[in-house]
Amino acid sequence: LGLGQPDFPTPEHARTAAVEAIESGATDAYTSNKGTVELREAIAEKTARDNGYDVDPEHVIATAGGSEALHIAIEAHVDAGQEVLIPDPGFVSYEALTHLAGGTPVPVDLREDLTMDPADVEAAITDDTAMFVVCSPANPTGAVQSEADMREFARIADEHDVVCLSDEVYERIVFEG
């Protein structure tokens, strides 16, 4: 287990918008390194609507994909020799991106229901820990952390002064049952 691969097509409205942008010439030049203003504003609106908190579009960076965003976050917060706690099994790039930053990946085994146990994360934290990664819904298992677990991860990050990198790439891909 290491990689989740969606098995559904790109939504029609997204395909149509991409074709229209190409045909209108809107894609003929570079954008800001942070992404277009319109996209960053849309991300801020989505965050307020769906996640319940406000984000200034000036503080939003739209990346070319999730791996680029993870790379930027890990490089920004992990110094050489520092540890990053990662779910095991988990997305294959967590380990590689930690190595690229000069860090040491520390696998944290999942529970039988394939979620991370906050107690296991807290027990694995050392003086060298810079960050721990939580992915929910998880890649590649699809397991979803409970709200109580997520609140506990926030407490752990605050109390231990470490970064909790919450990988939410699949936040809308949740199936009941």
Language-model features: locations:
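Conserved catalytic-core motifs of eukaryotic protein kinase domains, centered on the activation segment
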Residues: 7, 12, 54-55, 96, ...
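Active-site phosphate-binding strand-loop segment of PLP-dependent enzymes
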Residues: 112-176
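N-terminal small-domain helix-loop-helix segment of the aminotransferase-like
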Residues: 2-65, 72
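Short glycine-rich anion-binding loops that position phosphate/pyrophosphate groups of nucleotides
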Residues: 6, 67, 91, 136-139, ...
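Alpha-helical structural signal in soluble globular domains
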Residues: 17-21, 42, 46, 97, ...
